[in-house]
Amino acid sequence: MAKFNGLRPYLAMALVVIALFALAPPAAAQSGGPPDYRQYFGADSRLVIWVVAQLHLLFAAFVLGVPIFALITEFVGHRTGEKRFDKLAHDFTKLLAASFSTTAAFGGLLAFSLFALYPTFMSHLSDIFTPTYAWYGILFFAEAFTMYFYLYSWDWLAGQRKKWHLWTGLLLNIFGVAIMLIANSWVSFMMTPPLAQVNEETGEVIRQGLNVLSLEWTGTLWQAINNPLWSPLNIHRFIGNVAFGGFIVGAYAAVRFLNARTREARAYYDWMGYIGNFIGVAALIPMPFAGYYMGREVYSYSAVMGNNMMGGAFSWTFIIQAILIGALFIGANFYLWSGMSRIPGSERYLKYIKWLDVVLILCFAIWLTPHNLPLSPEEQVIMGGQFHPTLKFLGLMAAKNAVINFIIIATFLSFLLYRRGNKGERVPVSQQGVSSKIVVLAGFVVVALVLGWYAFRLFTLNPAELDLSPNKAVYFTLPAVLLVAQILAGAVAVALTLKDRGVTGQMIYVAVTVLNSVLILGPYGFTVMTQANPFLRNIAVAQWLITMSGLVFITAIDIVLLRGAEEIGAIRWGQMTERSQYALILLVVGVVMLMSLMGYIRSGLREDWHVFGVLRDTSASALTPSMAYMARVIAGIVAAFIALVAFVFWLAGLGESGEVEPGTMFPLRAAPQPSASQTITEPAGAGGND
């Protein structure tokens, strides 16, 4: 097994070298050119690319996400001196190394398949992006060497040299993110290519870009990279990759927990599963907003593509997406609630769980309610039309925006209850010193500046920017006023916290957050939809800022409130129910399904275009699959990925016992040190684990 591990870097390097040679334009292009399309043994070329690309992206998401929190965890271990954090970061990196060569293999297969099956399209793309291919290869080499050095130098760069190991981890993350940015430029260009604009009368070029008629690119490489969808896709994928990596780690820890045979191992893998779930949920919380930003840019570029996304052939895929997102939030909350059983004193807060559960279920029901239903003519007559007279309103974006904010707030409150479970008497803020007051004030200042900036933006917004008449400016006032009210509520919370009434301040700020973001701006969104529809996107931004301000500011207060608080008892790591571990495993199944579905939506929105609106796909498979066909393909991808991950992790674990060294989770009792006049009466070896 050690020999196999040593060969991994060389296998990955070989695949990249071969792929780079494959990226060179084929010689046949110089003599008549290659055919537009080819097939592998008669297989559907689009299906081949779909499956290979999605499997590559899933592994790549894990490879990008894991180094981020591995570095953070290692840094925490370095600063605190706790052995368990360093071991956790090392275990994260072992999982990364096990997946890296598989990612490279699928990447090489994808490159071969694209150039073999779609030579004309890839030739067109290469005319624009050839320099990025070289940079991609160089960065991949750099990432591979850095990753294996980061793994194998763990013990060598320990102690006084630890800072150099941390710098290596930072470099690894920089290379990984840079690779993602380059790859995102290719796929985002296919959806939103910057088009050249020419004055029809004078022939003067107004804007450089892609010529629709000649397919000639007249812009710069940076213009092609920085296309309208590039930044939203970068944000969405980066956050998604972190969430994905966290849930994968959580599932891995759950399997290890279920097979652990010692108390130390069960405690360690229980803690590892908690960290993985925490990372997944923390990244999952901003995901809906990142997705909304991306969808907004799709609409801005092409109303046709945007309407098709939410109201056309792809509308029902978003109902499936809603089900999966809701299931992830409910599963993550269930795990947190189950975890309270291992926290002494948490029974004080169990009475609140049922109310959070009610909020989550009701919001989930609204979140997945469709606007229109696939009805027969007879059913439409019975119901009085295509839309349900009442439930149709729950299918609109105004309702969706409100409930997703409520789901996020409820999830955040679950974590606050979990965090507060074993805390007893608190140290008054007035007795904590200057640093605590700085934390509270700094949190408030950051929140106030962001909310104040957007409130000013809404107060001064010109309706013409949204293609609205001047009289529509009246609809801009309410959200701006609510943003100011949120700032004032923050000031009240600060004053109460400094007066040792921080819990009351938190409750007030949570109540105002729910009131403004959900109960006022939610229904107000329906008015905006009918009277000033383009402004609905600004309503969504205001809701998001209010919700995120609540999360950030309440966390700042909570850190101060619990600083130095008495503990009712230590968390009993390892004393966790088995069903909670199955929840972690189901979470990873759900997130793999969600990422596969969203990959299909993003790519499928182009329909029969290789490059939307410019280069049409004229192959036999240039069609939008049915929902049933899409579901079968995604189910196959999910099953294949989970099987591959299980196999890769099993292979990487050969030769390892899976047990945890004593002292990792539970400190060893130190033997008493006798003075010069004392003798040791305790027999040797009497010290053991707590």
Predicted regions and their residues:
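Membrane-proximal extracellular juxtamembrane segment immediately upstream
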Residues: 371-389, 450-480, 512-552, 559, ...
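N-terminal secretory/membrane targeting signals
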Residues: 1-29
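Transmembrane-helix bundle segments that line or gate the permeation/cavity pathway
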Residues: 19, 64-69, 100-121, 134-163, ...
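Juxtamembrane membrane-water interface segments of multi-pass membrane proteins
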Residues: 68-94, 112-124, 149-165, 249-275, ...
